[in-house]
Amino acid sequence: MGKDTIADLLTSIRNADMNKKGTVRVVSTNITENIVKILLREGFIESVRKHQESNRYFLVLTLRHQRRKTRKGIYRTRTFLKRISRPGLRIYANYQGIPKVLGGMGIAILSTSRGIMTDREARLNRIGGEVLCYIW
């Protein structure tokens, strides 16, 4: 039985966000590095650094916490992450069938023949692929 490193990455970020942690440490693989680069570029995390411990590499992510003020006080905005395609049920979409997350407000991350990219990049390049996760 294999490990789902993408689900581990998303769960670690989600748990750290719910517990108001500033940093998260996740195992570094090629897929997780590409997903973290997309999250950094889209502004969901602040910074990334690679850390080595006894022959294993880890990514240390600094989360972005936004605060907004309402009548009842200050509250934190949350980052929602949802795994779509999983090892037991793969979900594929052609470029015309790539879903828009929250009407274009969120992003979908796809694994295509040209690498891991967002839904907007895949539509511009007119290529489809496996829908890995939604982020909004």
Curated annotation (Swiss-Prot):
Superkingdom of this protein's organism: Eukaryota
Matches recorded under InterPro entries: Ribosomal_uS8, Ribosomal_uS8_CS, Ribosomal_uS8_sf
SUPFAM superfamilies (UniProt xref): Ribosomal protein S8
Entry's Gene Ontology BP terms: translation
UniProtKB keywords: Chloroplast, Plastid, Ribonucleoprotein, Ribosomal protein, RNA-binding, rRNA-binding
GO MF assignments: rRNA binding; structural constituent of ribosome
Keyword Transmembrane: no
Localization terms from the record: Plastid, Chloroplast
Ranges in a coiled coil: none
Covalent S-S links between cysteines: none
Entry's Gene Ontology cellular component terms: chloroplast; ribonucleoprotein complex; ribosome
NCBIfam families (alphabetical): PRK00136.1 (NF001109)
Similarity comment text for this entry: Belongs to the universal ribosomal protein uS8 family.
Record text on subunit structure and interactions: Part of the 30S ribosomal subunit.
Purpose: One of the primary rRNA binding proteins, it binds directly to 16S rRNA central domain where it helps coordinate assembly of the platform of the 30S subunit.
Protein name: Small ribosomal subunit protein uS8c
Originating organism: Saccharum hybrid
